[in-house]
Amino acid sequence: MRLTEKSEGEQQLKPNNSNAPNEDQEEEIQQSEQHTPARQRTQRADTQPSRCRLPSRRTPTTSSDRTINLLEVLPWPTEWIFNPYRLPALFELYPEFLLVFKEAFHDISHCLKAQMEKIGLPIILHLFALSTLYFYKFFLPTILSLSFFILLVLLLLLFIIVFILIFF
């Protein structure tokens, strides 16, 4: 129950009907609907969107609560994600390719062992020569770091070449 004012100032008890809006509110709603274009009204209850959420002409509207399925976006097959240890289809259809790669790997490994035996002595001599520079303590850290960096780069290049020969 709420109190409403009469023209003479009398107050009378009137039941509160929350479902029925006032006449003034109805007029305001009708006026705002007349001024608002139909395309700017939202789908829910024909309410106007706030100014910060007006639809943009440049960017399409998207919902922010939608989950993105990355499996449809990735450029590789989904089988590779679920089972990374599975062989590619080429090896499953033609298993003799595995034998070719196995033989090539053994040939390359024997060649690398022979090369390392040839290079092994100079590497040992190189490290021995660097160890004699112990008396030159000021230059030793710089020379050691440079020499090991060069050795690391050479080994990295060697592994890259082996990888290319095996897999390509």
Swiss-Prot record:
A GO CC term assigned to this protein in UniProt: membrane
Q: Where is the composition biased (Polar residues)?
A: 13-22, 35-48
Q: How does it sit in the membrane?
A: Multi-pass membrane protein
So where does this one cross the membrane?
A: 119-139, 148-168
Q: Where is the composition biased (Basic and acidic residues)?
A: 1-11
Q: Where is this region: Disordered?
A: 1-63
Where in the cell? Answer: Membrane
Q: Where is the composition biased (Low complexity)?
A: 49-63
Give UniProt keywords alphabetically: Membrane, Transmembrane, Transmembrane helix
Please identify the protein, giving its name as recorded.
Answer: Transmembrane protein 31
| Organism, as annotated | Homo sapiens (Human)
